[in-house]
């Protein structure tokens, strides 16, 4: 797919096949953006408890963005659930038809997100979804404060 999209070209050395690009990381990133999609399959709101091990708790959405940038968090917390975590918990969750005060948001992701530790020294035990997944989940948001935070987040991507 990477070759078909024009991001890389394939070449062979002996029996091995390799990919190469004459473009730098930034150019590849700019070209690839159009083909990337959000990892969030769907989002639910609930008052029901979701039982996860401490190592599995992962902030998502605006909660994660507020830990990694200067944007303010909402009062309600948002967490990420992998497909497996969702399957394990969904029978015990009463999903609300819409966001309610005091409810918790869960974003069900298409894949298991790599955890990223928050830079906030006061919450060193807080894990967030990886920066790329977070960026993708907000990229078409349209809110100017979110766009500014995404720009800051994008500058920190390590290639």
Predicted regions and their residues:
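A broad, low-amplitude sensor of folded, mature protein cores
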Residues: 1-4, 135
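A short, conserved structural fragment
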Residues: 3-14
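Minor-groove-contacting beta-hairpin "wing" of winged helix-turn-helix DNA-binding domains
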Residues: 15-22
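Basic, amphipathic "hinge/linker" alpha-helix immediately C-terminal to the N-terminal HTH DNA-binding motif
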Residues: 23-28
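Long, low-complexity, charge-rich intrinsically disordered regions
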Residues: 30-159
């Amino acid at each position: 797919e990477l070759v078909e999209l024009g991001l890389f070209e394939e070449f062979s050395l002996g029996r091995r096949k390799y990919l190469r690009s004459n473009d730098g990381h930034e150019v590849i990133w700019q070209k690839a953006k159009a083909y990337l999609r959000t990892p969030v399959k769907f989002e639910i709101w609930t008052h029901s408890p979701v039982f996860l091990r401490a190592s599995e708790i992962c902030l998502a959405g605006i909660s994660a963005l507020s830990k990694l940038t200067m944007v303010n968090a909402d009062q309600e917390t948002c967490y990420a659930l992998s497909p497996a975590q969702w399957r394990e918990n969904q029978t015990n969750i009463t999903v609300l038809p819409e966001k309610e005060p005091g409810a918790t948001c869960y974003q069900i992701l298409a894949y298991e997100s790599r955890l990223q530790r928050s830079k906030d020294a006061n919450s060193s035990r807080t894990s967030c979804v990886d920066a790329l997944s977070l960026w993708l989940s907000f990229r078409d948001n349209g809110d100017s404060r979110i766009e500014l935070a995404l720009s800051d987040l994008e500058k920190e991507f390590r290639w």
